[in-house]
Structures are given as C-alpha cells and as structure tokens.
Amino acid sequence: MVEIAHFGVEAWLNKWEKSATYDISQSTIASLSMHDLLNLDGNNGEEFYEMLDKQQMNYGWIEGSPEFKEEVAKLYHHVDPENILQTNGATGANILALYALINPGDHVIAEYPSYQQLYDIPKSLGADVDYWHIHEEDDWYPRIDDLKALVKPNTKMICLNNANNPTGTYLSRFWGQPVYMHF
C-alpha cells in the first residue's frame, strides 16, 4: 500500500485558517460571492443568470472542455489542445503527473524547501529523492552546479516549484535556460 506523508501545510491550514483574524497564508485566488459571480457580465447578472439558468447540469467533459483546452493551448508554442489536461487545481495536476511518470527505483531531484507533495509523493511511489537546496545568500535560488552533482543515470524528473513555496522566489526563464538546455 502506498503511504503518503502527512501534508504539513494542509494540516496547519485546516486547524488555523478559518479562525485567523488576518489570513496572509493563502496562495489561491479570492473566492467569489454569488453576487460577484452574477455580476461578472456587467449587467447586474441578468444575462449571465439567464444563460446559467438554461444550462443542463451534468458531469461535463471527462477530458476537459474542448473550448477551454483550445484557449489554454493558445498560451503556448506548439501545444496541441489534445495534450492539455484540465484538472481541479495544481494539487490534482501534480498528483496525476507524478503517478503517471514516476516508478519505483526512479530518481527524482526536488527543489527544497518546496511544496511538500513534489518530494513526498515520489518517495511514496518508491523513487529515490534528492533535495536540490535553495540558498538565502543566492536570493533563494538553487545552484546549477549543485544540480549537476545530483543528476544520476536514472534521474527521471527534476521538480521545480515556481514561484517557490514557501519563499515566493520566481525562477526567471533566463535563470532556467541552463537547466532546460542541459537536461
């Protein structure tokens, strides 16, 4: 049986986020009230509600909305909409990618500290995980030379969390170019 480590940040949020006076921990978008949702069309929600009221409630597209996939594909160069996988949040997307790509005995390099599931889920799948540490003196960037030393013949995946969680550091495309080109 696969054992996944206790997800520390989620446990902490479950305990404290609803009782906090000020919540500065969120990394998600602000939620909408029904009033906000109905007023998205700028017409007091009348047209939007009329359109919504006529919609058949069903399970939806199993592989994601074709229209949504078309729009997402336009954001990238040379990406076919058939290769877009729509998920409910990044957590689900991460789990799907890790379960699809990682096998026992694979080697994974994970930026650390980072989003816990990016190193604990590969471990739970039987992968050998090495941490690619970030450094305060380098503005919380990991070092490329450290990465080169971590790579093994069976390295299957390098996990980067961009923007980094917990530091918020954004790894620029320019910084990442040696990583993308070398590996």
Description of each model-found segment:
Residues D80-I84, P104-H107, N154:
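Short acidic capping loops at alpha-helix termini that bridge into adjacent secondary structure
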Residues L75-H78, L98-I102:
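Glycine-rich helix-loop-beta junction characteristic of Rossmann-like nucleotide cofactor-binding loops
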Residues Y112, D130-E137:
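Short beta->alpha connector loops at strand-helix junctions that form conserved
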Residues A100-P122:
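Conserved PLP-anchoring active-site segment centered on the Schiff-base-forming lysine
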Residues I24-S27, V72, I84, V108, ...:
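Generic structural signal for small/hydrophobic residues in well-ordered secondary structure
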Residues E136-F183:
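Active-site phosphate-binding strand-loop segment of PLP-dependent enzymes
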Residues V2-G89:
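N-terminal small-domain helix-loop-helix segment of the aminotransferase-like
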Residues K123-V129:
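A short helix-loop-beta submotif of the ANL/AMP-binding
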